[in-house]
Amino acid sequence: MASSPVGVPSPQPSRANGNINLGPSANPNARPTDFDFLKVIGKGNYGKVLLAKRKSDGAFYAVKVLQKKSILKNKEQSHIMAERNVLLKNVRHPFLVGLRYSFQTPEKLYFVLDYVNGGELFFHLQREHRFLEPRARFYTAEVASAIGYLHSLNIIYRDLKPENILLDCQGHVVLTDFGLCKECVEPEETTSTFCGTPEYLAPEVLRKEPYDRAVDWWCLGAVLYEMLHGLPPFFNTDVAQMYENILHQPLQIPGGRTVAACDLLQGLLHKDQRQRLGSKEDFLDIKNHMFFSPINWDDLYHKRLTPPFNPNVEGPADLKHFDPEFTQEAVSKSIGCTPDTMSSSSGASSAFLGFSYAQDDDDILDS
């Protein structure tokens, strides 16, 4: 299992009173009591993800519920707001999770997201250990399409790993968790925050050098390597030794791989970000690599390609692809309670001004 993301110091809020105000945003008037919260399906540093059924129409959603106090204690509010911003910019790309609502109570933040129940790629890798090349190629292509789309919006993802790659009920990829995304990075610009998950950190991040969007292509290479070989490329249980391996150890590719797969891994996992595949033409470099020659990218984008694996879920209540560690946990009653006072002018609530969001009614009805 991958380590938790490396902690990142948050930028200081822009307002003198400590609030983060993103300006006016629509208020959906949503309440926790609008939903029946059925099962815990995931957990993170600051809260949980729950399967929820909307009472008004019976629609199922994945609701990410975050504790404001935990976020503020760790000075992570800017990253939570950045995650919301990235979700808002996703105009329904087929391989990115969609945000339907976001709202808040005085104690909690709520992201109402598309419900995806085919399981994490991590879950399937744990069970099957490794994938054959055609299956790994399919997932890598769909993830690359999603990353390329984020880059086109000047967003660097920065935390690509099997735990953040979900499968939908048909077996297509859905990329989720945008908490470490960096916005507003132009193609020639760099950033320098030390963040990510240890197994997938690029050398330039470890060296604390300025880095650009090529950092995501390193992570894609690490995930592809893990799909084909069962472990990340420079894995060691000793994190310090693993960092040393990432920085200095030559890439070792076990036998049995095609020439195209080996060439792609060597290109994506090049230690010099300036020479890495994707450093010149970004997603086009990946798209045009010979490893993906069997892929019709237009058919891929429009989901006209049959996924190599079907999760065979029997409807929204089928949770067999979720870790029982989560699904067997009791749902806290406080998650579904709507406090008498839904707003506050100070404290935790004021740090998340501008958080609430609702899609247009037409979008909600069409979903």
Curated annotation (Swiss-Prot):
Location of this chain's protein in the cell: Cytoplasm; Nucleus
Entry's EC annotation: 2.7.11.1
Keywords: ATP-binding, Cytoplasm, Kinase, Nucleotide-binding, Nucleus, Phosphoprotein, Serine/threonine-protein kinase, Transferase
Catalytic activity: L-seryl-[protein] + ATP = O-phospho-L-seryl-[protein] + ADP + H(+); L-threonyl-[protein] + ATP = O-phospho-L-threonyl-[protein] + ADP + H(+)
GO cellular component: a single term: nucleoplasm
SUPFAM superfamilies the UniProt entry points to: Protein kinase-like (PK-like) (SSF56112)
Tissue note: Expressed in the proximal tubule and thick ascending limb of the loop of Henle (TALH).
Domain AGC-kinase C-terminal residues, every copy: 293-367
Modification note: Activated by phosphorylation on Ser-356 by an unknown kinase (may be mTORC2 but not confirmed), transforming it into a substrate for PDPK1 which then phosphorylates it on Thr-193.
Post-translational modification Phosphotyrosine, affected residues: Y357
Positions bearing Phosphothreonine: T193
Binding site for ATP: I41, G42, K43, G44, N45, Y46, G47, K48, V49, K64
GO BP: any one term: intracellular signal transduction
Domain called Protein kinase: residue spans: 35-292
InterPro entries: AGC-kinase_C (IPR000961), Kinase-like_dom_sf (IPR011009), Pkinase_C (IPR017892), Prot_kinase_dom (IPR000719), Protein_kinase_ATP_BS (IPR017441), Ser/Thr_kinase_AS (IPR008271)
Homology family: Belongs to the protein kinase superfamily. AGC Ser/Thr protein kinase family.
Listed name of the protein: Serine/threonine-protein kinase Sgk2
Organism: Rattus norvegicus (Rat)
Name of the gene: Sgk2
